[in-house]
Regions:
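Short cysteine-rich clusters marking metal-coordination/redox-active sites
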Residues: 10-17, 48-50, 88
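Short recognition patches in nucleic-acid-associated and regulatory proteins
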Residues: 15-40, 105
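Short metal-binding segments enriched for Cys and/or His
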Residues: 41-66
């Protein structure tokens, strides 16, 4: 996987790209990091969704930065085309599950996720590196696959 380099700079945004990160709860960071929790300061953390950057979590002052190597799970936003990367962390649906599925099976996957959410069985704040529900990622992947399929199937 190719990443851009991320030099440390002090800026109230992503340390390398100078874009705003998505705020995540401290419990998300603590649950998903593979480092000793002694290394995790009690500060605000932001999530970097930029695919070409190895940084996953960073503090606004860039004093704390954690990369893909520090996270227990592979991060979908960093590897959106990875077949064996989870798109849904709570109910364990991978990109390959969705890419290989028929339209009926895709509907069943979305229904499975919705059923789990409605039953209170999801823990996106602890299991998903972005710290929030995966359903948007799942639907975006389905749309991307559907669009790519339509382009491939259109007459030229």
């Amino acid at each position: 996987m190719l990443f851009v380099s991320c030099p440390r700079i002090i800026f109230n945004a992503h340390p390398a790209l100078r874009i705003k990160g998505k705020p995540v709860q401290g419990q998300t960071v603590k649950a998903l990091l593979s480092v000793s929790l002694r290394e995790v300061q009690d500060v605000e953390y932001l999530f970097c969704k930029t695919q070409t950057c190895p940084v996953v979590y960073f503090s606004p002052d860039s004093e704390q930065t954690f990369t893909v190597e520090h996270v227990r799970e592979r991060v979908y936003q960093k590897e959106p085309d990875g077949d064996d990367v989870f798109v849904c962390y709570c109910f364990r649906h991978k990109g390959e599950d969705i890419r290989a599925a028929s339209s009926e099976t895709v509907t069943a996957i979305v229904d499975d996720i919705n059923t789990g959410i409605n039953a209170g069985q999801c823990a996106c704040d602890l299991r998903n590196p972005q710290g929030s529900c995966c359903l948007g990622n799942v639907r975006a992947l389905i749309k991307r696959i559907s669009t790519a399929t339509a382009v491939l199937e259109s007459p030229r």
